[in-house]
């Protein structure tokens, strides 16, 4: 939410708050109250506290240490439940999943998902169940990620390594996010529509700019999300017009991609891309896939498949630069297994347990979704850590599960602030399938991310080749100790300061 919108809102809220404080009394339902939380101001609730927090996920983590693993806040009239323990995460995401399985229709999400036609942001409905089934069984299968698109991953990683080799030869630094974002965008472009984003006039700059604006519009809160009566402020500040421009540009982009696939003279590809699969399914009489639904799914593919993978690679390299002993150990594993073959391919990854532990540890300490995509309750429920601390959660409550807090809880993880991949060598039972609720980087339950295999394949293969081919140093004049891990708000966890690193080509003796 922009600063000018905040000022206008606070000025308008004051007289309403005066009336509110006279007549509002907190009610108990069936003898049960809502979970505790920080006191807020009349009418606006905890809005100002959350707005001024530099990093909301860190602020909520700090608050949970005081108020507990179930904590209530309010943004205007909207109640928010923050969940910060594995036990309560399991209750919300599995045991009582049906009560918590919907999504709030935030302004940005609603507009950009074609009024909830996608799989990630759509409210719980029959439409969502059908789209989810299609994505799980047709689009994002393990076979499609690891076999059908194997050549895409390996070719694009090789292209990245070749560019970095030129950088190393010139003794230049690399902006890690730009490098990894370019890789992820190239892979997703080929997977989604069959060609690299810098081919045939698609335009690298155009696509990168659109994806950046898309991420912003999905991350930002609009005044109308929490204060509907003041929704006109979004128009006054230009946010509504900005959202409309973003939607129009993305819609035109999707339209171009789909129309290109419908051309009768389009060359056949050996591997179906995602648009091919959707068009084939759309032609079936039983299909519910409309063109707008296809576009909404493409939103999830681009938003979830580019920023998340790039961010995870940045955090992995950040952690390794800050922990040189771990860097050395994982490089020794990779180089001893691969030898002088020249590159790491997907078949090699299963023989690199320490590398895979590094990826897991990165997602524990730096989860790309520090707060899982919010859910919205569709019915009342009663939850609590024990029988003496049971609470009533009302319908239409926004629910955030804090992976940031769970991943850094000393009662769950030994030395949680230290980067120790060995913990995942000792815990072979921990995986990405959402069964161990102390570790659910991709979510859990019926809302678990369907694109797990595609994202993991990209990250593991890229990281393995980065560590196999190069040694890494900070820029000249910078020490390893100067590399920090400060974060900023966003739909995916981002570094506050860009990571610049210098590759040095490793020479086998």
Swiss-Prot record:
Region named Substrate specificity: 368-373
Superkingdom as given in the UniProt entry: Eukaryota
Main subcellular location of this protein, as a coarse class: membrane
Location of this chain's protein in the cell: Microsome membrane
Keyword terms, alphabetized: Endoplasmic reticulum, Heme, Iron, Membrane, Metal-binding, Microsome, Monooxygenase, Oxidoreductase, Transmembrane, Transmembrane helix
GO terms assigned for molecular function: heme binding; iron ion binding; monooxygenase activity; oxidoreductase activity, acting on paired donors, with incorporation or reduction of molecular oxygen
Cofactor(s) named in the record: heme
Membrane topology label: Single-pass membrane protein
GO CC term (a single one): membrane
Protein name, UniProt field: 5-OH-xanthotoxin synthase
Source species of the chain: Ammi majus (Bishop's weed)
